[in-house]
Swiss-Prot record:
Protein name, per record: Uncharacterized protein MPN_205
Stretches with biased composition (Basic and acidic residues): 156-170, 191-206
Chain intervals for the UniProt region annotation (Disordered): 1-22, 156-264
One Pfam match: P1_N
Origin species: Mycoplasma pneumoniae (strain ATCC 29342 / M129 / Subtype 1)
Biased composition (Low complexity): 171-189
Lineage of origin: Bacteria, Bacillati, Mycoplasmatota, Mycoplasmoidales, Mycoplasmoidaceae
Family: Belongs to the adhesin P1 family.
Amino acid sequence: MRDNTAKGITAGSGSQQTTYDPARTEATLTTTTFALRRYDLAGRALYDLDFSKLNPQTPTRDANCQITFNPFGGFGLSGSAPQQWNEVKNKVPVEVAQDPTDPYRFAVLLVPRSVVYYEQLQRGLALPNQGSSSGSGQQNTTIGAYGLKVKNAEADTAKSNEKLQGDESKSSNGSSSTSTTTQRGSTNSDTKVKALKIEVKKKSDSEDNGQLQLEKNDLANAPIKRGEESGQSVQLKADDFGTAPSSSGSGGNSNPGSPTPWRPWLATEQIHKDLPKWSASILILYDAPYARNRTAIDRVDHLDPKVMTANYPPSWRMPKWNHHGLWDWKARDVLFQTTGFDESNTSNTKQGFQKEADSDKSAPIALPFEAYFANIGNLTWFGQALLVFGGNGHVTKSAHTAPLSIWLYIYLVKAVTFRLLLANSLLSKSNIYKKTAN
């Protein structure tokens, strides 16, 4: 979790912790509660603010549009929750900033829970335990809500001649065929078994050492898609994985306790169509310790990536070179696949990435899934305004290359939102253009 300027509120502690942003280690995000922990001025922990269990109400205002508050009774509450609170409350806080002019007002950056799980999966961290390994009394931390397992490769000489081809396997090795079909929940020896087919090829620069490179079904570099079953080729889809266990069995499959489906790669258009569920959100929170009505939720704003990309300067719609002076083709492919622009569109005449070297077809640049959530942040209170910076979607392999920030959401006390576009750099004040939102 990222904590910029909040002095009285930070993340809770737990047995399992992981830092969401490695550059900021002063606060951590627990994988069990996803809660903010409130501290007093002496540094003593008071209580946790768990949004999934919180029943908030919006504060009341006086004739001057000021929040009504007294030290004993707390905030005046209207009795109604903020709009779309049921969707927002399931998101995870990843950054918090305290208003220097109001010790009770905080701005919280919320992201979908699946984004944090995806971040942990990319970093190779342990996922939340949802099961235990069979035959062992110890809990296996590598078996999480995704159903992932880690096991060292072992040679099995007894099954060196085994073939997953049903009748062919039965004729060549009857005992092996019987055991194979039994492991898959069937005792019928005539049942044919379909195996996962992965085609491989040698790298051109690694023929001597025998290293292999995936040619198809490369799930690490391409989004998971469901394809037609042809022969024995099997392709997975994103719904085969999940983010949280489902005790009612309403998840990705019909088995009890199966994980709910999630999509690790989201296009800009998908986030735009369902902002309460998939976008990053800004929550304005009022919290006053020792008061009867101590917590109130002022408002919720969603950060729309489609609006961000629509305001890109023309120069940013062209392909970019990385800091090595080389064009990152892998980054371009990831950009296409994660934004949904990998499909041909003959009517597309906008500036963007050239899809084919011998063609004039191009796709408009869009904010990738990872860049959208990774770059939005750096909450900063500036007087009565809150600045939220966002990235321009530049994809690079280097972890030290900071993308230019082009977007600021400014929150004012009178509930007026201004959006500013930085054309070149955050430090160049002469290139700021203002746009007032409706």
